[in-house]
Amino acid sequence: MEQSNIDLEGALRALCQRARTAARALAPLDRAQKDRALRAIAERLRAEAGEGKRSAVLAANAEDVAAARAAGVSEALVDRLVLDEARLAAIAGAVLEIAAASDPVGQVVGMERRPNGLLVGQVRVPLGVIAMIYESRPNVTVDAAVLCLKSGNAAILRGGKEAARSNAALGELISDALRSVGLPADAVQMVPSLDREATRILLGLTGMIDLAIPRGGEGLIRFVAENARVPVIQHYKGVNHLYADAGCDLEMACRLVENGKLQRPGVCNALECLLVHEDVAAPLLGRVAALSERGLELRGDAATCALVPSARKAAEDDYGREFLAPILAVRVVRSLDEAIEHIGRYGSMHTEVICTPRYDHAQRFLREVDASCVLVNASSRFNDGGELGLGAEIGISTTKLHAYGPMGLASLTTLKWIAYGEGQTR
């Protein structure tokens, strides 16, 4: 190993050791102590939002945004990067929502008396040290930090180079807030290097990292999966479908397409593919085609192109793509069976939607479609921690162990067996 890599590994091991020490200090804290830290973070975020151009966070973010645009980064990714007064205030509000949420740590699950008199059950405890590896979105820095803190975990954060200045400013804000309430600043640390080698080394530190959570594009997820020697929960891409069933409410279906695809095309719960039953293809696709006035581009199969002359012929890989742009793949299908088969082949186990008036079709779709969130007659945009009642989320897991779907506070804990006895022996 080169000397520079030895030095980097040593620095990362020292960082992880500080995190483990901080995690031991966090684990026994009561809710009031943790909430005090979260409120201190929210207060500083609100103060930054009120500073406008004098805000250190917004100034750092403006530099990141300018650099991203100069580098030719797409506007969808720039939108994920941008912070302004309103977004900072919204992040502060989300922190306060987490502070107001119940604390999962210490919750007792399923106590029962055994025949030998032992009282046994399980209690929720923190995981320990969580490494979060993510791209572009600086709000993830705050979300990950406060969710880890509230659940009693130490956080090691490695953001993308596009948001390096923003993340550094937010990291300093969080550290200052922790110190102000007497908690260890090492409870939330930023990886000091943006070199991919630092991420590879971090992912190999078994016994020091309890869980790694990658959140970003396909390349990042693949890199983490190939290099991790620590447990990983993946936040994979969102190749999300809407199936418009025979007899569906055409106005509703079009509304779900518009909201799912065009509200924020660059997010992971945006709609990427529309499957239309042949019985409603002509009237529904006529309505959807009108959304071209809002910049929507359709890429369809032969049946779609015959009904919508302005649609482009879809390539095979369009059906498995996360466009993150106002582009929608479309396919006309003959049955619910065909729709479910298509989703099984091209979906990413993220979010799937059916628009149908039929209860039996809805129930079958819910049972047979494998995704972290399946919705009936509702927008894909609802697969979100806040919308599902979790508050902010650390990610949307598309793996099944140990969490599936939006990961809130409870997903950042594990269950420990406990037993009360009166001297029983086996």
Curated annotation (Swiss-Prot):
CDD domains: ALDH_F18-19_ProA-GPR. Transmembrane segments: none annotated. SUPFAM superfamilies: ALDH-like. It holds the Pfam family Aldedh. This is Gamma-glutamyl phosphate reductase. GO terms for biological process: L-proline biosynthetic process. It is found in: Cytoplasm. Pathway: Amino-acid biosynthesis; L-proline biosynthesis; L-glutamate 5-semialdehyde from L-glutamate: step 2/2. Keywords: Amino-acid biosynthesis, Cytoplasm, NADP, Oxidoreductase, Proline biosynthesis. The keyword DNA-binding does not apply. Belongs to the gamma-glutamyl phosphate reductase family. It is an enzyme of class 1 (oxidoreductase). It comes from Sorangium cellulosum (strain So ce56) (Polyangium cellulosum (strain So ce56)). Its EC number is 1.2.1.41. Disulfide bonds: none annotated. Catalyzes the NADPH-dependent reduction of L-glutamate 5-phosphate into L-glutamate 5-semialdehyde and phosphate. The product spontaneously undergoes cyclization to form 1-pyrroline-5-carboxylate. GO terms for cellular component: cytoplasm. HAMAP family: ProA (MF_00412). It catalyses: L-glutamate 5-semialdehyde + phosphate + NADP(+) = L-glutamyl 5-phosphate + NADPH + H(+). GO terms for molecular function: glutamate-5-semialdehyde dehydrogenase activity; NADP binding.
